Amino acid sequence: MPLEKIPAILLIVLGMHIALTAPTPPTPKSQRRFGDGPVGINWLGGGINLIKANTIATSQIQLKQLTSIKAGYWTCAVAELCIIVAGTMESDSAWSKRVVALLLPNGKHPYCIRLTPTTTLATILVVSGAVIRYWCFREMGRYFTFHITILENHKLVMTGPYSIVRHPSYAGTILMAVGQVIWYTAPGSWLREGIIYQIKLAWLLIIPVILCMFLGLANTPRRMMAEDAMLKKEFGKEWDKWAKAVPYRLFPGIH
């Protein structure tokens, strides 16, 4: 029965919403000890030197863009929930017929929106990634921002997930991105079963999601190196000791 997919849908959309919502308000420039935005890396001279990145391309996605991306996730979730509910109603229900005709223009039965082993795997990946990111939010507190910076009275956080790898929030992001690709392209998903990708208007929702995942994954290595360089510059030997104790950046024993 499609009803069993409802918990998975809610877990996916709530996990993505929480993980993509900044845990702290934007930090005033006066409280930032390093720059007012993203940080780049200058490799000249064989060393890593921090440079302000206000004039270079960066991977920072503005909060307004994240809001539109989250709206896309919620739209897909609500669409699937409506289809599932419509499928449980009497076949002569006018509301059910309208919903199915609108959201499944190819004429498929509402039961096509279902939980499968593939979407179950996707749920596990997305929820795991979201939990990791939320753990990072809680562990870092006010130091976790959606921009790379050093705050006043900044402390080096080395506990919780940061005692396992140095950049656990990015590990969570990668798990979520992989899970999303599987979730939205697997059999049983609305985008696939309803052939929604053939509707031009639907790409207003699809493109921001794809762009978010691509930019996030493509720029993760540079952001990690920038953060390591910035923290090393700020904390010196304390960071060296932590990096020696926690040598992996993303996944223990792998990277």
Model-found features: residue ranges?
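Membrane-anchoring alpha-helices and their flanking helix-loop junctions
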Residues: 1-158, 175-255
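Glycine-rich acyl-CoA binding loop
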Residues: 160-171
